A protein has these predicted regions:
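Feature captures C-terminal
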Residues: 18-35, 84-86, 90-92, 98-103, ...
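Hard-cation-handling environments
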Residues: 31-33, 37-113
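C-terminal motif of bacterial Sec signal peptides marking the signal peptidase cleavage site
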Residues: 12-15
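Positively charged n-region of N-terminal signal peptides that target proteins for export
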Residues: 1-4
Length: 253
């Protein structure tokens, strides 16, 4: 008897239970444009609260680290800014005792332009906001050709001086040369790039076949730090930074 009442209760609960299905009756949406017009109506209390943080950020981002002749922008298949960043990868390699044959920097990792004139550390962070670190990999010539095919399929990435690719408008590789020479399939090529790409991301899966992979130890190996150091060195030498579009990647048909 003592088990009967709980059992009856369970039966009644099951009998009363109904399964409901839910369907979307309507959808409403609107687009909210977030731009600087909100800055005109920031409450005074919020301004006062944020002021000390803003001063701290400004103290870090406002120092001038470099100088450019004009605005450097990103564009495919080749651009001044992507050329510069790929060249900086090669330059940095020599600072770490490496002798890279070429450098690669992805267009997707370039998030802003470098302004004309004075360049601040904040400008560099805008260009390279991620914690990507410089790395060095060895690829065979055959794997390097695969890498160039993948770059062509993506419409172009940043490649260093000496690389000459001819591609079609629909992303096929026609020819590839390095320092005026054809790529030797059995040769070994040292590539400087960020660790994100060296892991085979952004469709550059040829990097998965890399050997002798190295990320330098210690602080200051992030891309933005290396870019900053290059800009500082050029500024100290009195050289405003520029980088021409010189046919590193050409669409020929």
């Amino acid at each position: 008897m003592k088990h009967l009442i709980p059992l009856l209760s369970l039966v009644l609960l099951c009998a009363c239970h109904t399964t409901r299905t839910w369907q979307v009756a309507s959808v409403e949406r609107t687009r909210l444009v977030v731009d600087n017009h909100y800055e005109a109506s920031i409450p005074e209390e919020a301004k006062q609260y944020l002021a000390p943080y803003a001063r701290q950020v400004d103290s870090i981002s406002s120092p001038i680290v470099g100088l450019t002749k004009h605005t450097l922008r990103r564009a495919q298949p080749e651009s001044e800014l992507s050329n510069l960043l790929a060249d900086i990868m090669v330059w940095a390699g020599k600072q770490y005792g490496e002798q890279p044959d070429l450098g690669i920097y992805n267009m997707g990792g370039i998030r802003a332009s470098l302004p004309a004139g004075d360049v601040t550390y904040g400008n560099v962070v805008d260009v390279a906001p991620f914690d990507n670190r410089i790395s060095f990999s060895t690829l065979t010539g055959a794997d390097l050709m695969d890498l160039f095919r993948q770059i062509a399929a993506r419409g172009g990435e940043g490649v260093s001086h000496g690389v000459a690719l001819e591609i079609t408008a629909n992303g096929e590789l026609i020819s590839a040369r390095l320092n005026g020479k054809e790529i030797a399939p059995e040769a070994q090529y040292r590539v400087a790039t960020i660790d994100y790409l060296a892991a085979g991301n952004d469709g550059l899966i040829a990097f998965k076949k890399k050997t002798n992979f190295r990320i330098p130890e210690g602080a200051g190996t992030e891309a933005r730090y290396i870019i900053t150091e290059y800009l500082r060195a050029e500024r100290a030498a009195g050289r405003p930074v520029e980088r021409p579009v010189e046919g590193r990647i050409r669409i020929v048909r």
